[in-house]
Amino acid sequence: MAENKHPDKPLKVLEQLGKEVLTEYLEKLVQSNVLKLKEEDKQKFNNAERSDKRWVFVDAMKKKHSKVGEMLLQTFFSVDPGSHHGEANLEMEEPEESLNTLKLCSPEEFTRLCREKTQEIYPIKEANGRTRKALIICNTEFKHLSLRYGANFDIIGMKGLLEDLGYDVVVKEELTAEGMESEMKDFAALSEHQTSDSTFLVLMSHGTLHGICGTMHSEKTPDVLQYDTIYQIFNNCHCPGLRDKPKVIIVQACRGGNSGEMWIRESSKPQLCRGVDLPRNMEADAVKLSHVEKDFIAFYSTTPHHLSYRDKTGGSYFITRLISCFRKHACSCHLFDIFLKVQQSFEKASIHSQMPTIDRATLTRYFYLFPGN
């Protein structure tokens, strides 16, 4: 019989039916104007592919910050974080409190570390007089590329973390490569850097091996801000206000199209695996430029040539774990150790794995954030 040759999968059928019912319900809510969405959000919802409408609705409700919106999202969208439509199936093991509570460094620990490691750590300015600034650039919507669902969670999370660490955060969204470069130059020229002790630059978008994509990017007409350009904008020649101060660059973006996992045998013999020729650093150039480019450290969400993954209803795995590690360990660990803990959280490989990567590190001392001081 036909039904024996093609047995139904009842759970799959029920899941699909549930999605259809939910989408129809959301369409009625939007059409009846019960939730009073902005006109641009309505248009975005109506123009979206049917399979994407639920995620467009989530983003629109997140902007409202209303009690009704919160109840709707909690009721309909509380699902397993590892099952989101082609996104990475990575285990989110960190407890919720670690994402919301920043552990503070006690005055005694602050005094001890400053006394014992005076020559080894970057000096921290007094909280009352310093003017720390941070810049977040996030591209979510693109003319030719897919929408980055869940990116709003990354903005909210990183902004909250940096504010808790004492930074005044500037957020810019939906920029072309030229627009990103212009915003960075304006940020680098801020007078507040003179009385600051450090800065954070957070870049979140689609990406390529050598740069971060602007909103107009396509294969035919690239719109990419080269990573080299960022270093040039903030180096000691062009940004004297941050000279000899830590400049931390966080990048959430793909750096190629390969997945980050491979299969190996449980054996001590060398394994054959897919490889690529990475560009070689030129030692002479590094020495020549060391006095110009110094006190940087970049932390990328993945290795060169590989993908980076994002949960449509919770944000990117990299940013989520980064925030968690900062909130738990910034009270006692310097920056490099915090980054190492983020990498360790990705150490167990799974399908669609990624490995965050520290790059272009020219810090000459340990950078402690000393939250609470």
From Swiss-Prot:
It holds the Pfam family Peptidase_C14. PROSITE patterns: CARD, CASPASE_CYS, CASPASE_HIS, CASPASE_P10, CASPASE_P20. Changing residue 285 to N: Impaired NLRP6 inflammasome-dependent activation and release of IL1B and IL18. Residues 1-59 are annotated as: Required for LPS-binding. Keywords: Cytoplasm, Endoplasmic reticulum, Hydrolase, Immunity, Inflammasome, Inflammatory response, Innate immunity, Membrane, Mitochondrion, Necrosis, Phosphoprotein, Protease, Secreted, Thiol protease, Zymogen. It is a peripheral membrane protein. The record marks 285-286 as: Cleavage. Changing residue 40 to M: No effect on LPS-binding, LPS-induced oligomerization, and LPS-induced pyroptosis. Residues 1-91 form the CARD domain. One of its GO terms (molecular function) is lipopolysaccharide binding. Gene3D superfamilies: 3.40.50.1460, Caspase-like, Death Domain, Fas. CDD domains: CARD_CASP1-like (cd08325), CASc (cd00032). The modification Phosphoserine is found at residue 83. Its EC number is 3.4.22.64. Inflammatory caspase that acts as the effector of the non-canonical inflammasome by mediating lipopolysaccharide (LPS)-induced pyroptosis. Also indirectly activates the NLRP3 and NLRP6 inflammasomes. Acts as a thiol protease that cleaves a tetrapeptide after an Asp residue at position P1: catalyzes cleavage of CGAS and GSDMD. In contrast to its human ortholog, does not cleave IL18. Belongs to the peptidase C14A family. This is Caspase-4. The gene is Casp4.
